[in-house]
Amino acid sequence: MNKEEIRNCLSTLYDAQALRIATSNRLFQIFSKETENSDTDIDSSKLNKSILEEYEKITDYKTDKKRSIKATLKDLKDELELIDTEEKFEQVKAYSFLLESEKTYNKLLQKAVEEHPVYTEFLSNVKGCGPLMAANIIAYLDPHKARHASAFFKYAGLDVVISTNKDGEPLTDDEGNLLTHGRSRSDTEEYEYVNKDGETATKKGLTYNPILKSKLIGVLASCIIKAKDPKYSKIYYDYKLRIQNMPKHQNKSKGHQNSMALRYMIKSLLNDLWTYWRTKENLPVTPPYAVSKLDMNPHGFNY
């Protein structure tokens, strides 16, 4: 699969996943009524497992005995606690189909990603980054459009925004420095797009991909820490210790400091990825902002 095909497969997988989750929740509502008089709390995962076990028992019996569903339910009525009608059987059958569809797309996506050079040569070496996470990165990031690593940061929603008051005026600290904050859904901007008539127009909205941001910060970051990736987990802990000892950050909560360190770690990963990917595509590679604009010394895999 090429990049576009991986993106389409990923989108279809998430659509199938959303439908499966919604169906699972509906089944839980239906079948939990069967156990609502129980003295114990109802566990949705255990209930779903029990439903699928009964479904498998019914389908196996139906196939082996060559019986109809109606006859099978009658034969097994003393062994079944949940699926006792044809209507319930058909609902679980549809749910089972969704599960299999999701597994199929997962396998297709995993196979495609494991053959993609960005995964085999770079992302597979990052502990905590599996094929599905890599699929999100490959599908949504484009080195041809990102002339600088900061373009990856912005598209992933990891750039900083100048804080303003209610009148839109920039806020500053006591020393006159501009105050900034991490980009969120409330930080919208005007940008150009091509409308249905093929004309360039402007509209106000998000300038980043919220799905990619949630995957990178909400999933990948914690996976890297848990997997103890030798490079990026060290970047996280070093930066966290650094900001804990900086006067301007000492009053921030531990959660805030942790979020800052996670963002810094993911940005370091994206910077390295951008450098690798642009080089792979024979595209120009520029030094990081800290090197080119702030005259800081380069380090690691900067360029």
Where do the protein language model's features map onto the residues?
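Phosphate-backbone recognition surface of nucleic-acid-processing proteins
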Residues: F122-L123, I137-S259, R263, Y276
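Amphipathic alpha-helical surface "interface" segments used
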Residues: E5, D43, N48-K49, D238-N245, ...
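Long, charge-rich intrinsically disordered scaffolds of nucleic-acid metabolism proteins
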Residues: M1-E115
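Basic, amphipathic alpha-helical segments enriched in Lys/Arg and hydrophobic/aromatic residues
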Residues: S253-A290, P298-F301
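Conserved aromatic-histidine-acidic binding/catalytic patches
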Residues: E4, N8-S11, D15, E86, ...
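Extended non-catalytic scaffold regions that mediate assembly and binding
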Residues: D41-I51, G176, G182, G198, ...
